[in-house]
């Protein structure tokens, strides 16, 4: 014999109206952009529905501190380009010339584990059209026809004594956060390498650094 309160509970449950379960919408194949991820974004990465009009604020502040003016766009895949220029002090020159701009057509990159991944063109956004990923990269200025000499990519560094040193201007890379897919199609936020500076590398001609 069941206790009286158990019988009452059983009768109550049997008399409850059945509640229809609404079908759950299929989950998106792309992971949502969670709020904590914003803290991991680099100023060199922009998530926007259109190409950014100018360099990141942090870059502008640094450029202003060193007296570097902004230039004109170089091509369709690099917007808001600026080139390093001589500082305001007379006689000062950069060891290596660099050019910076938004890369709008990046398709692949190398992740933190050294694997090539696909950089997704769109990032899902709640309540609106997806966002696109843009990367503000800094590279060594390419040597132009008739403008050879030190300070350009692949060339020697400006102001280095060639009798004692071998020098070369090379791009330096840093890691930034981006939405990517690996070779198995797994989508996720990963750290990828992009060009962020043009630096001078030195090698002693005598074999000693």
From Swiss-Prot:
Signal peptide as annotated in the record: 1-21
Known glycosylation sites: 75
Cysteine pairs bridged by disulfides in the record: 96-169, 140-198, 157-200
InterPro entries for this protein: Cystine-knot_cytokine, Nerve_growth_factor-like, Nerve_growth_factor-rel, Nerve_growth_factor_CS, Neurotrophin-4
The keyword Ribosomal protein appears for this protein: no
PROSITE patterns (UniProt xref): NGF_1 (PS00248), NGF_2 (PS50270)
Compartment list: Secreted
Function: Target-derived survival factor for peripheral sensory sympathetic neurons. May promote ameloblast differentiation and subsequent reduction in proliferation of ameloblasts.
Name this protein carries in UniProt: Neurotrophin-4
Species of origin: Rattus norvegicus (Rat)
Gene this protein is translated from: Ntf4
